[in-house]
Swiss-Prot record:
This is Autophagy protein 5. It is a peripheral membrane protein. Its main location: membrane. Conjugated with ATG12. Keywords: Autophagy, Isopeptide bond, Membrane, Protein transport, Transport, Ubl conjugation. Pfam families: ATG5_HBR (PF20637), ATG5_UblA (PF20638), ATG5_UblB (PF04106). It comes from Pichia angusta. Belongs to the ATG5 family. Conjugated to ATG12; which is essential for autophagy. Gene3D superfamilies: 3.10.20.620, Autophagy protein Apg5, helix rich domain, Phosphatidylinositol 3-kinase Catalytic Subunit, Chain A, domain 1. It comes from the Eukaryota. One of its GO terms (biological process) is autophagy of mitochondrion. The gene is ATG5. One of its GO terms (molecular function) is Atg8-family ligase activity. GO terms for cellular component: Atg12-Atg5-Atg16 complex; autophagosome; mitochondria-associated endoplasmic reticulum membrane contact site; phagophore; phagophore assembly site membrane.
Length: 277
């Protein structure tokens, strides 16, 4: 499969979701809202459509104008600043994945500020977050975020529009402008590795990217207890966009093909269950 085909599949991946309205927000029986949500997006991208559906059932219809809604899955608050697919890979088990429908509760009161970043009422809060992530990714790649900071307003708006509307061709065209001209000029790669159970996040520091570093090499160096072999899965699997990543893949190639809309390659680690051996 070519690089462009993989990128197209990454951007085309969806999750089938069922949203329930928190019972405290309505005085009547409320149907669920069903929708296919792109993995490579944010939950709040879908909020306008969700609220439009639930507005007739709200005790206080004025709440539909607010952005300070939050989402919960099996009593676990979901981080709005994570891509949808990453959230799903982090919080679901194999048994839940088999259901093929992700059930989420839409909530408003008792915002979990100890776990989820508070939402600014500024209408551009999501774009501001995305831009900050892109600046960080650019800094990791180049040692400077100037390429993002010096973008014209038009280019910045077009870039965000491409990300939010899943225009992978336009997104890739603009993202290539942030990449160094050669592999030897890469300072590092924007990668985040999420460990199971502990909610711990690791951002590896890579050096000498001129040589081929495989995902197996990276994970064996970072977390040898979970990846004692750089060639075989023995304890855990690395996931991104819902698929198990091959350990022999070049980490640079993986980044180019499977980075998310925020410019990072997100890798979630899941323990291998006994029945998988």
């Amino acid at each position: 499969m070519s690089t462009s085909e993989i990128i197209s599949r990454v951007w085309g991946g969806v999750l089938y979701m069922q949203f329930h309205l928190d019972r405290a927000l309505s005085n009547q029986e409320c149907p669920s809202f069903y929708v296919a949500v792109h993995r490579n997006s944010y939950l709040h991208n879908s909020l306008p459509a969700i609220l439009q559906f639930f507005k007739p059932f709200l005790k206080d219809a004025r709440l539909a104008q607010s952005q300070k809604w939050w989402f919960e899955f099996e009593k676990v608050p979901l981080k709005w600043n994570f891509p949808v697919g990453l959230l799903y890979d982090l919080v679901t088990t194999d048994a839940q994945v088999e259901k093929q429908m992700w059930e989420i509760t839409l909530k408003y009161y008792d915002y979990p500020i100890e776990y989820v970043i508070p939402i600014d009422q500024n209408p551009s809060f999501l774009k501001d977050h995305w831009t900050n992530q892109l600046k960080e990714a650019c800094f990791i790649l180049n040692g400077s975020s100037k390429l993002v900071m010096n973008m014209s307003r038009t280019d910045s708006d077009d870039f965000y529009h491409a990300a939010i509307h899943k225009d992978s061709t336009q997104f890739e065209s603009m993202f290539r402008k942030l990449l160094p001209s050669s592999v030897s000029s890469l300072k590092n790669l924007p990668i985040k590795v999420y460990l199971p159970l502990s909610n711990k996040l690791i951002q590896p520091v890579l050096s000498n990217l001129g040589r081929k570093i495989t995902l197996g090499n990276l994970l064996q160096d970072l977390i040898p207890d979970l990846f004692p072999s750089s060639l075989m899965y023995t304890v855990a699997h690395p996931y991104s966009h819902g698929v198990v990543l091959p350990l022999d893949s070049s980490i640079i190639d993986l980044y180019i093909c499977m980075k998310s809309l925020d410019g990072f390659l997100h890798i979630s680690i899941k323990m291998i269950q006994k029945n998988e051996h």
